[in-house]
């Protein structure tokens, strides 16, 4: 299995993504943002960071990069695309996922571990998690507040497109770290092949880091190929 990790200027989670994919047994290769051909890959990973310095809006300039036309074709063919943090922002700016990621309600960059509940486990990314499991995953963003108009929110909820939702790790009342509507932490496309999420599963794949809750996310992709 071979995945492309797109490198945008300013991205800084590409090595984390490579480590996580390879730990799951997936061959990972870096692809520069000027690339226009993604043939031969089984999946595409858009990593976190600050592409183009987050100028204009987070992900706005990266969404216009040459590689995104190839990513769009890739997604239209039903192949897997994952965007984490800045990658999620890029997917919404490119129109590959609905909604937008706005500035955190507290107007601060937030970096900590949060509770993330698995809402669906019928996708390659989540099939190794029990539905309803609350994961402990890191976040690190200043613009992670998911927003969509009421009609879009109703469609996301009605069609089961919310995959991850912020949830309490213990009994904390302020478990939503950024003010995301409906506590949304991650969504998927109607085809189920394009996933965007703000928490970082790739930063929670090794005991050395004190947390492996993110590893099944990547192992599930391998299981999908084996089916």
Curated annotation (Swiss-Prot):
Alphabetical list of SMART domains matching this protein: GATase_5
Pathway in which this enzyme or protein is active: Purine metabolism; IMP biosynthesis via de novo pathway; 5-amino-1-(5-phospho-D-ribosyl)imidazole from N(2)-formyl-N(1)-(5-phospho-D-ribosyl)glycinamide: step 1/2
GO cellular component: cytoplasm
Subcellular location: Cytoplasm
Glutamine amidotransferase type-1 domain span: 2-227
GO terms assigned for molecular function: ATP binding; glutaminase activity; phosphoribosylformylglycinamidine synthase activity
Keyword vocabulary terms for this entry: ATP-binding, Cytoplasm, Glutamine amidotransferase, Hydrolase, Ligase, Nucleotide-binding, Purine biosynthesis
Principal localisation: cytoplasm
Annotated CDD domains: GATase1_FGAR_AT
Annotated active site: 85, 200, 202
Hydrolase keyword on record: yes
Highest taxon of the lineage: Bacteria
Catalysed reaction, written as an equation: N(2)-formyl-N(1)-(5-phospho-beta-D-ribosyl)glycinamide + L-glutamine + ATP + H2O = 2-formamido-N(1)-(5-O-phospho-beta-D-ribosyl)acetamidine + L-glutamate + ADP + phosphate + H(+); L-glutamine + H2O = L-glutamate + NH4(+)
GO biological process terms, semicolon-separated: 'de novo' IMP biosynthetic process
This enzyme's EC code(s): 6.3.5.3, 3.5.1.2
PROSITE patterns with a match to the protein in the record: GATASE_TYPE_1 (PS51273)
Quaternary structure and partners: Part of the FGAM synthase complex composed of 1 PurL, 1 PurQ and 2 PurS subunits.
Function: Part of the phosphoribosylformylglycinamidine synthase complex involved in the purines biosynthetic pathway. Catalyzes the ATP-dependent conversion of formylglycinamide ribonucleotide (FGAR) and glutamine to yield formylglycinamidine ribonucleotide (FGAM) and glutamate. The FGAM synthase complex is composed of three subunits. PurQ produces an ammonia molecule by converting glutamine to glutamate. PurL transfers the ammonia molecule to FGAR to form FGAM in an ATP-dependent manner.
Protein name in the entry: Phosphoribosylformylglycinamidine synthase subunit PurQ
UniProt organism field: Thermus thermophilus (strain ATCC 27634 / DSM 579 / HB8)
Gene (UniProt): purQ
């Amino acid at each position: 299995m071979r995945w492309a990790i797109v490198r945008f200027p300013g991205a800084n989670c590409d090595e984390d993504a490579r480590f996580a994919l390879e730990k799951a047994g997936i061959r990972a290769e870096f692809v520069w943002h000027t690339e226009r051909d993604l043939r031969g890959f089984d999946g595409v990973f858009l990593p976190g960071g600050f592409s183009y310095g987050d100028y204009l809006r987070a992900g706005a300039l990266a969404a216009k990069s040459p590689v995104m036309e190839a990513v769009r074709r890739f997604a239209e063919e039903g192949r897997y695309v994952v965007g984490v943090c800045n990658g999620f922002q890029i997917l919404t700016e490119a129109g590959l996922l609905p909604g937008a990621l706005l500035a955190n309600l507290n107007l601060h960059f937030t970096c900590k571990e949060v509770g993330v509940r698995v809402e669906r486990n019928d996708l390659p990314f989540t099939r190794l998690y029990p539905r309803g499991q609350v994961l402990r995953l890191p976040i690190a963003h200043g613009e992670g507040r998911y927003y969509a108009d009421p009609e879009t929110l109703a469609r996301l909820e009605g069609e089961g497109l919310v995959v991850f939702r912020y949830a309490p790790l213990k009994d904390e009342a302020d478990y939503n770290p950024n003010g995301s509507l409906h506590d949304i932490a991650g969504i998927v496309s109607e085809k189920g092949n394009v996933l965007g999420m703000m928490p970082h599963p790739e930063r929670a794949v090794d005991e050395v880091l004190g947390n492996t809750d993110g590893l099944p996310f990547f192992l599930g992709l391998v299981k999908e190929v084996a089916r």
